Amino acid sequence: MAAKLLLLLCLFSGLHARSRRVEEDDSEDSPSNQKWVLAPKSQDTDVTLILNKLLREYDKKLRPDIGIKPTVIDVDIYVNSIGPVSSINMEYQIDIFFAQTWTDSRLRFNSTMKILTLNSNMVGLIWIPDTIFRNSKTAEAHWITTPNQLLRIWNDGKILYTLRLTINAECQLQLHNFPMDAHACPLTFSSYGYPKEEMIYRWRKNSVEAADQKSWRLYQFDFMGLRNTTEIVTTSAGDYVVMTIYFELSRRMGYFTIQTYIPCILTVVLSWVSFWIKKDATPARTTLGITTVLTMTTLSTIARKSLPRVSYVTAMDLFVTVCFLFVFAALMEYATLNYYSSCRKPTIRKKKTSLLHPDSTRWIPDRISLQAPSNYSLLDMRPPPPVMITLNNSMYWQEFEDTCVYECLDGKDCQSFFCCYEECKSGSWRRGRIHIDVSELDSYSRVFFPTSFLLFNLVYWVGYLYL
């Protein structure tokens, strides 16, 4: 009896040890990570069997439902960052997660698992949409530390394919209002080879989302929002469904205000200082005028470095040009003042002819009143005063001692709007002419230049900022 009990005990001990070995064999235990890595063999075997079965007769060269109906691609994009934007190259950089979802009936499977989450090694084994970005100059997929790709397959054949891309996309900037301009930079994509009869793109709900803008590199722009569109583009190869996202950007003026606008305004104001300098200080006024003109030329060159070589006039070009004209006009004002106010020394001219000769006056009137001294002393060597002829309340001088560079009075009406001496203000001026005293030109400029520049700024800023 004791021998039978001992035999039964040995038998049960052997069965228990065997069952324990079987349980240990049903799980894989990594030697280096025994505490947290446990993968049942049966599940690995199921996934491997499912994939082998799906790919056994799968042809990745053919799109799903070929010859039956078009393949529908649902698209959504997550914008990781935007920027910088290059105005010179007319392009911008964008970092996105690009996700495409479609259904491939050839990849349906029956299993207790609903989703197969796979890595990038499976991407090359199934059909993938041939999506291209139509306005990209360069594009780069991220491969560190592994290819940034995600592939998921549902048991009903739905496939999700996601990858991370950095794209330098073209953005045609219209710089007429620069630097107060706003732009809608597009990101356009479509199929490379499948027309709309074979492939259709659709936006998913909440298809475009953006990350926190704190990490964006929009140094000179503010992000105002985005919008997406769908259109059909006709080409010689067929009609294609084209998807576009527009990123609304508005330029910040702070940089250009500091670098261009404020220096230009201060240079114009500096050129007005010459109006308060005496007109006899020719070196000081000339140096100041030439310096301000050269400064405006330098500022104009610097302002153009931030722009491509466009053929039209931008808002900044207009402002810099007008400022240059104001500075140049201030220099020309002194040149005009100096020219008309510089008189020669008085000269004494004797008339060798008498009033009896026809050449003694400009012309011979019908009634002449001659006024001259009646008696002269033989010892008085002073020249006689000039002879004056009076006709119909008009005064004509036979001789004029103060002869200026510009001769206004010589029997002719003044041909200029400027007076170079006091007698010009008398009847020798043509009636209806504007009388401007050249000696008061600085006084006029002190009012005219600031007023006109203030009016220009008022029209400029209101027109570009609010109209």
UniProtKB/Swiss-Prot annotation:
GO MF, any single term: transmitter-gated monoatomic ion channel activity involved in regulation of postsynaptic membrane potential
**Cytoplasmic face: residue ranges?**
278-283, 333-446
How is this protein positioned relative to the membrane? Multi-pass membrane protein
Q: Which UniProt keywords apply?
A: Cell membrane, Chloride, Chloride channel, Disulfide bond, Glycoprotein, Ion channel, Ion transport, Lipoprotein, Membrane, Palmitate, Postsynaptic cell membrane, Signal, Synapse, Transmembrane, Transmembrane helix, Transport
| Activity regulation, per record | Allosterically potentiated by alphaxalone. Allosterically inhibited by pregnenolone sulfate. Inhibited by zinc and lanthanum.
Which tissues carry this protein?
Expressed in brain.
Q: Does the keyword Amino-acid biosynthesis apply?
A: no
Report the PROSITE patterns cross-referenced here: NEUROTR_ION_CHANNEL (PS00236)
* Catalytic activity reported: chloride(in) = chloride(out)
* Glycan-carrying positions: N110, N228
Q: How does it assemble?
A: Heteropentamer, formed by a combination of alpha (GABRA1-6), beta (GABRB1-3), gamma (GABRG1-3), delta (GABRD), epsilon (GABRE), rho (GABRR1-3), pi (GABRP) and theta (GABRQ) chains, each subunit exhibiting distinct physiological and pharmacological properties.
Give the comment on domains: GABAARs subunits share a common topological structure: a peptide sequence made up of a long extracellular N-terminal, four transmembrane domains, intracellular or cytoplasmic domain located between the third and the fourth transmembrane domains.
Protein name (record)? Gamma-aminobutyric acid receptor subunit gamma-3
Gene assigned in the entry: Gabrg3
